[in-house]
């Protein structure tokens, strides 16, 4: 009888521990790193089509497809410098030399910010905040937490994210 009681007790503990596995908040936690997507961006007067990749380590790349004048350019950001790559050549700029209004810096500031609690709306899970004195609104899919759109009005930045998926390292 003692062994049965121990068995039942152990089973209850195991079930209790398993109930917590994989639990998510109802809105899904916002995913601001560790994802890749296609980004349709309106930045000032420029319309941009690019592939945005944010690694789990916090670095970011923006690979431009449009406008044609930027096609093939890849901007990288790791928090300490920005890299510009084109045709196998690469140039690194220290963070203090990168203008505050640079697209990659603006994206990195918003996606790298600590996000306060958001609000569920018809658009999705909306996170409003401020970084470097600029207000932003980041909309995430309520089920997955993956970004859907971003607005930074003061910078003239409006972005829509599609084909969004969790980041997979090429070496995996």
Where are these regions (language model features)?
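C-terminal motif of bacterial Sec signal peptides marking the signal peptidase cleavage site
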Residues: 16-20
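Flexible, processing/modification-adjacent segments and terminal tails
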Residues: 27-31, 35, 84-134
């Amino acid at each position: 009888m003692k062994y049965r009681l121990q068995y039942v007790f152990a089973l209850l503990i195991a079930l209790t521990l398993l109930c917590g596995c994989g639990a998510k908040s109802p809105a899904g936690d916002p995913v601001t790193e560790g994802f890749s997507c296609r980004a349709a961006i309106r930045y000032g007067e420029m319309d941009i089509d690019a592939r945005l990749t944010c690694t789990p380590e916090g670095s970011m790349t923006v690979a431009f497809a449009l406008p044609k004048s930027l096609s093939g350019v890849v901007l990288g950001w790791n928090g300490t410098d920005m890299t510009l790559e084109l045709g196998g050549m690469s140039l690194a700029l220290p963070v203090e030399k990168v203008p505050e209004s640079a697209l990659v810096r603006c994206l990195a500031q918003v996606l790298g910010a600590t996000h306060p609690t958001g609000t569920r709306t018809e658009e999705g899970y909306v996170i409003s905040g401020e970084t470097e004195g600029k207000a932003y609104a980041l909309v995430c899919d309520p089920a997955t937490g993956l970004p859907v759109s971003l607005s930074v009005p003061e910078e003239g930045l409006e972005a829509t994210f599609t084909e969004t998926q969790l980041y997979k390292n090429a070496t995996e």
